[in-house]
């Protein structure tokens, strides 16, 4: 059995709408979400994105729910707070010592550069006024964004899978790989090197971005990939397993796609449930070309 045969993998079948796109048509996206279940409450954070001409990723919202489908917005962060052109994938993490941290992906104005920032506060409503700290500044050579962050339940080591875009070749900044980092506090990180990249000639040739952890033993992840530059923003979902030194994509599995418009099925976030199932949140294309945030249980 390949890892693609895992019964917990998501698909578009049976999905429910959680957050609709902020408008109709291409470029309007609700998604790039991450979610966590804490004391019976689902906490969800996502970016609200409009077309390039209307501001791109203007806000990040944080909401709560007791059923995982119907959410009440608790707070919101605006791009102006960070002086950035756009916001992309956020991550909300409950801190082991108490309190919350919101990680944000921020785009530098008039460039292809991205960095990862953060806000830390005692409560979720207090996050917009929380303590700000840059987590990873990126560089002139590399843009960094869309972190996946977890705390290992055994070692208590913080883990990050970070999407990296090389900026050294103009016109090719959409290429992406994933690096693995560790930390003792979630603020200062050690870079463990590249762990996932696209495969020449395959559906993920242009890049591979880890999106969520499906299981830990063995380590199985979902990732976004695409074949070419023209598919930028329309990634689809694949699966990979840790082989002891890096993540290896399932060689037999086709990517999971939306049946609508550009086919995007990306930024999956997996939430383990008490009954052994998994609730997924995914950004998926709809018929008019917009992207909704959907959820499903496997």
Placement of each model-derived feature along the sequence:
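Beta-rich carbohydrate-recognition and catalytic domains
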Residues: 1-85, 93-206, 214-263, 272-298
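A basic- and aromatic-enriched beta-loop-alpha substructure that forms the phosphate/nucleotide-
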Residues: 88
């Amino acid at each position: 059995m390949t890892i693609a045969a895992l019964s917990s993998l998501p698909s578009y079948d049976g999905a429910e709408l959680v957050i609709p796109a902020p408008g109709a048509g291409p470029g309007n996206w609700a998604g790039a979400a991450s979610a966590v279940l804490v004391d019976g409450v689902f906490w969800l954070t996502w970016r609200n994105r409009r077309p390039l001409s209307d501001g791109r990723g203007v806000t990040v919202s944080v909401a709560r729910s007791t059923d995982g489908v119907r959410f009440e917005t608790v707070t919101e962060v605006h791009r102006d707070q960070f002086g950035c052109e756009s916001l992309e994938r956020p991550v909300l993490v409950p801190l082991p010592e108490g309190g919350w941290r919101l990680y944000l992906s921020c785009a530098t104005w008039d460039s292809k550069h991205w960095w990862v920032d953060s806000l830390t506060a005692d409560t979720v409503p207090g996050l917009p006024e929380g303590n700000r700290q840059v987590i990873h500044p990126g560089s002139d050579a590399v843009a960094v964004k869309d972190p996946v962050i977890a705390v290992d339940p055994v070692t208590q080591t913080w883990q990050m899978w970070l999407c990296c875009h090389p900026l050294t070749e103009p016109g090719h900044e959409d290429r992406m790989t994933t690096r693995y980092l560790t930390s003792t506090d979630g603020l200062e990180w050690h870079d463990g090197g590249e762990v996932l990249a696209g495969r020449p000639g395959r559906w993920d040739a242009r890049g591979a971005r880890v999106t969520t952890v499906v299981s830990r033993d063995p380590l199985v992840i979902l990732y976004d990939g695409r074949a070419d530059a023209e598919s930028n923003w329309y990634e689809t979902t694949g699966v990979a397993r840790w082989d002891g030194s890096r993540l290896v994509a399932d060689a037999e599995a086709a990517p999971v796609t939306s049946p609508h418009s550009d086919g995007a099925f990306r930024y999956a976030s997996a939430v383990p449930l008490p009954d052994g199932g998994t609730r997924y949140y995914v950004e998926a294309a709809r018929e008019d070309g917009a992207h909704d945030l959907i959820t499903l249980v496997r």
